[in-house]
């Protein structure tokens, strides 16, 4: 499967899922973006169009770079996202895997968020 057809497939799945899955302020949408070297996760309120909480494996100012296997780093990102969400009073989310298969880093991030206390 060429990279273009993979991209087109993911975009088609993404549109189809987005028409059904929607986040609110009480139960935001947890969306995942996966690049070759990093992973990003956001809690989005689709009603107002705002990102409520975000976490990534990309180091921010003053933060250290997460080391280890990509799936282990993804699990830590999920836990960090859950901590930030708990601080904002969010405990339930709707999971949007963004067209990616529920496998590997996406699965590890979801499990980390569950370990951190998020329900979905």
UniProtKB/Swiss-Prot annotation:
Record text on subunit structure and interactions: Part of the 50S ribosomal subunit; part of the 5S rRNA/L5/L18/L25 subcomplex. Contacts the 5S and 23S rRNAs.
Lineage of this protein's species? Answer: Bacteria, Pseudomonadati, Chlorobiota, Chlorobiia, Chlorobiales
Record's keyword terms, sorted: Ribonucleoprotein, Ribosomal protein, RNA-binding, rRNA-binding
Please give the name of this protein.
Large ribosomal subunit protein uL18
Gene Ontology molecular functions: 5S rRNA binding; structural constituent of ribosome
Tell me the protein family, please.
Belongs to the universal ribosomal protein uL18 family.
What CDD domains does this protein's entry cite?
Answer: Ribosomal_L18_L5e
Matching entries from Gene3D superfamilies are given as:
3.30.420.100
The UniProt function text for this chain reads:
This is one of the proteins that bind and probably mediate the attachment of the 5S RNA into the large ribosomal subunit, where it forms part of the central protuberance.
Asked whether the UniProt record includes rRNA-binding among its keywords, one would answer yes
Checking Pfam families in the record gives:
Ribosomal_L18p
Answer whether the UniProt record assigns the keyword Ribosomal protein to this protein.
yes
Q: Show the PANTHER family listed in the entry.
A: 39S RIBOSOMAL PROTEIN L18, MITOCHONDRIAL (PTHR12899), LARGE RIBOSOMAL SUBUNIT PROTEIN UL18M (PTHR12899:SF3)
